[in-house]
C-alpha cells in the first residue's frame, strides 16, 4: 500500500487527478471505476480541465460507478447517476452509453447486481478504481461487517452513513436506507485502486485502514491485500498515523526511484 501524505485537500485532488490523467494517456480505452461524494469533486474538475486542454480524451473510456441509492431514478437530484452527469459526464467528451451506474430503480435489484458484475467482466475489468472513505471505514456502501470478498449486492446503510448523507436531502424528503454497491471483492479486482481522504474527521478511519488489523469492522482495511493501492491523504487525515514521518520518507524515496526509471 502506497501512502501519499500531502499538505491540503487541493494537493490531494491534483495528485489524484494526475494518476488518472497518466492512465488515460497510457491507455485511451481505460475502464475507470468512479466514486461520488464531496472528496472527488476537485479531482473531477482536474479531469475536466485536462480534457478541455486536449491532454486527455474520454471518447474510448468506459466507466463504472461504485454505488447507487436503491429507490432513486437516475433523474433524481440525489441519485449518483445525476451527480456524475452534473459533476463530470456533461463536461467531457465521453459516450454516456459507456458510463454505468448501478440501477437504483431496478425492478429486480438482485438480478441487477449480477448484471453489473457481468458488465464489468465484459469490459475487461476495471483498470483504476477511485475511492473515498467513510468515517466508519466504509468504501462504496460496504459498511462495517461487509464480507471482504463480497460482490455487487444490495446493502442496508448504517445510521452513521444515513446521518452523514442527510445533508444532501431536503428536510422531509425521502432518503433511501438501501443501496446497490460494488462489493469489496469487486473493488479488489481492479488493477489499481486510488483512495482519497481529507480532513481530521477521516483520521480514525485512515488509521484503521493503514495500521489496523485486516478486519470486516473496517472495510477499507481490505486494501492491505491489494498489490497496487494508493492512499492519497492530507495532513489532517494522516494526523493519527503513528508512522506518518516514515510514510513520507518512503514516498520521497519512491519518487526518486520512479524518476530514475523514467516512470
Curated annotation (Swiss-Prot):
It comes from the Bacteria. One of its GO terms (cellular component) is cytoplasm. It holds the Pfam family Glucosamine_iso. It is an enzyme of class 3 (hydrolase). Keywords: Carbohydrate metabolism, Hydrolase. Its EC number is 3.5.99.6. It catalyses: alpha-D-glucosamine 6-phosphate + H2O = beta-D-fructose 6-phosphate + NH4(+). GO terms for molecular function: glucosamine-6-phosphate deaminase activity; identical protein binding. The active site is at residues 67, 136, 138, 143. Pathway: Amino-sugar metabolism; N-acetylneuraminate degradation; D-fructose 6-phosphate from N-acetylneuraminate: step 5/5. Homohexamer. Belongs to the glucosamine/galactosamine-6-phosphate isomerase family. NagB subfamily. Catalyzes the reversible isomerization-deamination of glucosamine 6-phosphate (GlcN6P) to form fructose 6-phosphate (Fru6P) and ammonium ion. This is Glucosamine-6-phosphate deaminase. It comes from Shewanella halifaxensis (strain HAW-EB4).
